[in-house]
Regions:
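Short active-site-adjacent structural elements
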Residues: 17, 143, 169-175
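Active-site oxyanion/phosphate-handling segment shared across diverse enzymes
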Residues: 138-158, 162-168
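Glycine-rich beta-alpha junction loops
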Residues: 74, 167-170
Length: 199
């Protein structure tokens, strides 16, 4: 697969007192390739700064064409490709390094926002059998920081980047919150990746 497309897919480790992160489990179950694209998989820490540095380094050393970062958005009912990232870190809880920024820019002097460079509408359409919709806010925690930082770093290059949030999974036992079967998340993300490699 030397001439094929390469997609870096990342998941986060557990955070906020959880023992698991559904994205880490979904990542393990994703295929090694989708369509003609080879997947490069990595689990990254739920930490401001380090997560971004790690993903940029992985993307550059593997010479990937696209980056799809996965994250947990507890309380959402849908798999949600993110349309936009904003230039602020405003954490309701500390990250896994104990850092809790309040109203700090991701990039000092950077633009207010960046749009994802992945085809978010096509990704949602490809997930037709799974509950999926475009999200217009990625929050202000580590996920948004990662997406903003990637879009800033790779602006003007051929490397496309985006983020997909997923719901809690049943194993997390959130009786009062929407949950999704892990298998359904894996299926949805696989289809979304198919749309990325086809675009």
């Amino acid at each position: 697969n030397t001439g094929g497309m390469k997609i870096l897919v990342t998941a986060f480790d557990a955070f906020g007192g959880e023992s698991i992160n559904p994205t880490e489990q979904a990542l393990e179950l994703l295929p090694e390739e989708v369509g003609g694209a080879e997947l490069v998989k990595a689990v990254i820490p739920t930490k401001f700064g380090e997560s971004l540095r790690r993903v940029i380094a992985l993307a550059e050393e593997s010479s990937v064409d696209a980056i799809v970062c996965l994250g947990q958005a507890g309380g959402r009912k849908h798999i949600t490709p993110e349309r936009v990232a904003i230039n602020v870190m405003d954490a309701e809880i500390p990250d896994n390094a104990g850092y809790q920024p309040v109203d700090v820019p991701v990039v000092e002097g950077g633009p207010a926002a960046y749009f994802s460079t992945l085809p978010v509408k096509e990704m949602v359409a490809a997930m037709e059998d799974c509950p999926a919709r475009v999200s217009n806010t990625a929050g202000t925690f580590v996920c948004n920081q990662l997406l903003y930082g990637l879009l800033h770093h790779f602006a003007g290059t051929e490397v496309r980047a985006g983020f997909v949030h997923v719901p809690y999974i049943q194993e997390q036992n959130k009786a009062d919150k929407p949950m999704m079967a892990l298998a359904e998340i894996v299926e949805g993300i696989t289809r979304a990746l198919w749309a990325v490699q086809a675009s």
